[in-house]
Swiss-Prot record:
Keyword Transferase carried by entry: yes
UniProt KW keywords: Cytoplasm, Glycosyltransferase, Purine salvage, Transferase
Reactions accelerated catalytically: AMP + diphosphate = 5-phospho-alpha-D-ribose 1-diphosphate + adenine
Protein name (record): Adenine phosphoribosyltransferase
PANTHER family: ADENINE PHOSPHORIBOSYLTRANSFERASE (PTHR32315:SF3)
UniProt cross-references to InterPro entries, sorted A to Z: Ade_phspho_trans (IPR005764), PRibTrfase_dom (IPR000836), PRTase-like (IPR029057), UPRTase/APRTase (IPR050054)
């Protein structure tokens, strides 16, 4: 099964000139979604980690079933004000402005080995910010994986020093 067949292009979303890679057709098809999670599992089989972290919202869709399949813990990374307990945060630059991500202060402990998972790896900014936040609290990044990588945006430049893998590359 070719997973690219389940990803559609949405022109000019979220703004003119952007071609958005929409993974929702894959989610609607149980066979394709199963192949996606199995492919992610295969992609990370040689990484050593005890936790998977992912940013909201689409990162959760892929990371949570992967964590369950691999019997690893899952840590949600959220936008400010969405988590009920004490948080640690990181601010990072976007094309226009800045954004902030948070996680619970007790989610990652010194020595935890962490895998970062998201649906799309575009510029690498979100993944880099998550990696910095994990490292700030004593975790180690074992790897960074995504379903889709937009290689023409050169995300690996921002993520040099980390092992980065993707199932589909455009």
């Amino acid at each position: 099964m070719n997973l690219k067949d389940f990803i559609r292009d949405i022109p000019d979303f979220p703004k003119p000139g952007i071609i958005f890679k929409d993974v929702t057709p894959m989610l609607k098809d149980p066979g394709a979604f199963k192949v996606c999670i199995s492919s992610l599992k295969e992609l990370v089989k040689d990484f050593e980690f005890n936790l998977i972290v992912a940013p909201e919202a689409r990162g959760f869709i892929f990371a949570a079933p992967l964590a369950l399949e691999l019997e690893k813990g899952f840590v949600p990374i959220r936008k400010p004000g969405k988590l009920p307990y004490k948080t640690v945060s990181v601010e990072y630059s976007l094309e226009y402005g800045t954004a902030t991500l948070e996680m619970h202060t007790d989610a990652i402990k010194e020595g935890d080995k962490v895998l970062i998972v998201d649906d799309v790896l575009a510029t690498g900014g979100t993944m880099k910010a998550i990696a910095e936040m994990v490292e700030k609290v004593g975790g180690t990044i074992s790897g960074i994986v995504s379903l889709v990588e937009l290689s023409f945006l050169e995300p690996r430049k921002k993520l040099s020093g980390y092992e980065v893998r993707s199932i589909i590359t455009y």
